[in-house]
């Protein structure tokens, strides 16, 4: 899995599963066309739409030093009716 890091399971993403939309975090340097091509090739599905947004990094403190986590990109992938993606591994939060 080059582009997709892990599936996202929030209240909104679980609600979107009923509309055949799947949510996952992807590498921030990946483009929409790369992710679409990769999903269609790996899962054997037809993607009809993709929405993406970049989420900001958060501040992390280690003692007196304040750090920053990396920003990441989240994709919402809409599939054609009749296609589905098996559940991806869930990342524990």
Swiss-Prot record:
Keywords: Chloroplast, Plastid, Ribonucleoprotein, Ribosomal protein, RNA-binding, rRNA-binding. InterPro entries: Nucleotide-bd_a/b_plait_sf, Ribosomal_uL23-like, Ribosomal_uL23/eL15/eS24_sf, Ribosomal_uL23_CS. GO terms for biological process: translation. It is found in: Plastid, Chloroplast. GO terms for molecular function: mRNA binding; rRNA binding; structural constituent of ribosome. PANTHER family: 60S RIBOSOMAL PROTEIN L23A. Part of the 50S ribosomal subunit. Belongs to the universal ribosomal protein uL23 family. This is Large ribosomal subunit protein uL23cz/uL23cy. It comes from Panax ginseng (Korean ginseng).
């Amino acid at each position: 899995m080059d582009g997709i890091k892990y599936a996202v399971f929030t209240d909104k993403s679980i609600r979107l599963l009923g509309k055949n939309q799947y949510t996952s975090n992807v590498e921030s340097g990946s483009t929409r066309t790369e992710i679409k091509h990769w999903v269609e090739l790996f899962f054997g599905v037809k993607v009809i739409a993709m929405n993406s947004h970049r989420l900001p990094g958060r501040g992390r403190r280690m003692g007196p030093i304040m750090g920053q986590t990396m920003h990441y990109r989240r994709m919402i992938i809409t599939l054609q009716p009749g296609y589905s993606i098996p559940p991806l591994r869930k990342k524990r939060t």
